[in-house]
């Protein structure tokens, strides 16, 4: 089972709000997830993360998506790099 750290959209029409979640890569964007690691509000550029849990999942092989990797660099998680296939 390949596990990704990705954004799950929430909120209403024209007011997006995202949850940063750990999910199986085959599950839909707003579908089931394993664990919620934080939130991202693009309207206020506010990011809230459970940093120890993010590090735990990355050390266990979870791959962050390109967008999440960019968000993880913001609070200073140097270990979180963009996945290799995102350099297209």
From Swiss-Prot:
This is Small ribosomal subunit protein bS16. Belongs to the bacterial ribosomal protein bS16 family. It comes from the Bacteria. InterPro entries: Ribosomal_bS16, Ribosomal_bS16_dom_sf. GO terms for biological process: translation. GO terms for molecular function: structural constituent of ribosome. Keywords: Ribonucleoprotein, Ribosomal protein. GO terms for cellular component: cytoplasm; small ribosomal subunit. It holds the Pfam family Ribosomal_S16. It comes from Sorangium cellulosum (strain So ce56).
């Amino acid at each position: 089972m390949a596990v990704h750290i990705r954004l799950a959209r929430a909120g209403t029409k024209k007011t997006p709000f995202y949850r940063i979640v750990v999910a199986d890569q085959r599950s839909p964007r707003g579908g089931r997830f394993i664990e919620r690691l934080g939130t991202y509000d693009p309207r206020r550029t506010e990011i809230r993360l459970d940093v120890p849990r993010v590090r735990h999942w990355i050390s266990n092989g979870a791959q962050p998506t390109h967008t999440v990797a960019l968000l993880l660099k913001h609070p200073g998680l140097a270990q979180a790099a963009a996945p290799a296939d995102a350099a297209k």
